[in-house]
Regions:
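Short glycine-rich or small-residue beta-strand-to-loop segments that form or flank ligand, phosphate
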Residues: 8-11, 151, 244-246, 306-309
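Conserved active-site and cofactor/substrate-binding residues in soluble primary-metabolism enzymes
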Residues: 17, 131, 155-162, 211-218, ...
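Alpha-helical scaffold segments in soluble metabolic enzymes
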Residues: 21, 25, 162-166, 219-223, ...
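Short, solvent-exposed beta-strand edge segments and adjacent coil->beta transition regions
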Residues: 147, 206, 240-244, 303-305
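N-terminal Rossmann-like NAD(P) cofactor-binding subdomain of oxidoreductases
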Residues: 2-202, 207-209, 296-299, 334, ...
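C-terminal substrate-binding/catalytic lobe of Rossmann-fold NAD(P)-dependent dehydrogenases
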Residues: 198, 212-279
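C-terminal active-site/capping subdomain that shapes the small-molecule cofactor and substrate pocket
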Residues: 246-344
């Protein structure tokens, strides 16, 4: 929509962790310019006061209250809002901007009947569900080209779907009885203070949560094509997701070598996927838009094991959103996105 060489973008809900990560990545993006950042709870505050790490790029930027008129003519808007908060504003934004990318859950599930079951409320604009493409480029890239609406995947579904999808699409595993155990850093719980995410609660602790009820379960099933038993865990770290997926091969002769070769071939042209024999670590993906994968077949028990690691705030949220925006807006997919993690 813009004739400016740099695409003009905005963020609704920029004061949370995913919003701050969007700001960091856009600040280093050579073809995007952030022109408005809303954060109703921080309206009137300088970005640098809440996130000193963003001072060099946003020295004078102030969070504003949401006003739809501020987004007139923008090339894209990213929504970093809580569950159910994007639905009331999307129709209006579609009239104003080139592409709406929702980092929340409001448009990920295609069946509106799933929302009251998993999110406790009816979907208020079910007619718009089909306007949103599911934003996992490695699986749905062609659908993202020129998309007006993008439902950016959740962090757990990103890690699980990228691990399982190659085997499902190749017809190599049973699609029932799949197990996904995944651990996330505490940033996945958001910036708001909660008793179970304080330093004292998280440090030197490791626990499962959302037993049988986690909202990412139907999303993982929708994207991977598997029936899954999903158990998330909270790990004593800030960033990262490590997902361990278990499935039964359909062919008893399927081997570790076969599994690794399948992953390598499936993702051979993917700039953000690393397949290796080495067991992935979350630290290796810190700050990067990459996913590290490996696989093993246990001949003794007959189980296929697939492990994936990613940064929940980058590939699992804001980096994935930028990747989708690049595709939807006709830019090179990798523009502005880091592929190397921070070590040590």
């Amino acid at each position: 929509m813009s004739t400016n060489p740099r695409l003009r973008v905005g963020i609704v809900g920029a004061s949370g962790f995913t919003g701050a990560e969007l700001m960091r990545l856009i600040g280093g993006h050579p073809l995007m310019e952030l022109v408005v950042a809303t954060g109703d709870t921080q309206a009137g505050s300088k970005v640098r006061d809440l996130y000193p790490s963003l001072s060099s790029e946003y020295d004078d930027m102030v969070y504003s209250e949401y006003d739809a008129s501020e987004f007139d003519g923008l090339d894209a808007v990213f929504l970093g809002l809580p569950h159910m908060a994007s639905q009331p504003i999307v129709s209006e934004l579609f009239k104003k901007v080139g592409c709406v990318l929702d980092l929340g859950s409001d448009f990920r599930l295609k069946d509106p009947n799933l929302y009251p079951l998993w999110y406790g409320a009816e979907h208020s604009v079910p007619e718009l569900l089909d306007e949103f493409v599911y934003g996992l480029p490695e699986i749905f890239r062609s659908d993202l080209e020129g998309a007006r609406g993008v439902a950016v995947p959740g962090c757990y579904p990103t890690s699980a779907a990228l691990a399982l999808s190659p085997f499902v699409q190749a017809g190599k595993i049973q699609t029932t009885g799949v197990i996904v155990d995944a651990a996330s850093g505490v940033s996945g719980a958001g910036r708001a203070a909660k008793p179970n995410t304080t330093f004292a609660a998280v440090d030197e602790n490791f626990n499962a949560y959302g037993l049988l009820t986690h909202r990412h379960t139907p999303e993982i099933e929708q994207v991977s094509g598997c029936q899954v038993l999903f158990t998330p865990h909270l790990a004593p770290m800030v960033r990262g997701i490590l997902a361990t997926c278990y499935a039964r091969p359909l062919d008893s002769s399927f081997s570790t070598e076969d599994a690794l070769e399948l992953l390598e071939q499936f993702y051979s042209d993917e700039p953000f996927i690393v397949v290796d024999e080495t067991s992935p670590s979350t630290k290796a993906t810190l700050g990067a838009n990459t996913v590290h994968l490996t696989a093993r077949v246990d001949e003794r028990t007959g189980w296929l094991l697939i492990i994936s690691a990613l940064d929940n705030l980058v590939k699992g949220a804001s980096g994935g959103a930028i990747q989708c925006a690049n595709i939807a807006l006709g830019l090179e997919e990798t523009t502005g996105l880091p592929t190397s993690g921070l070590m040590p």
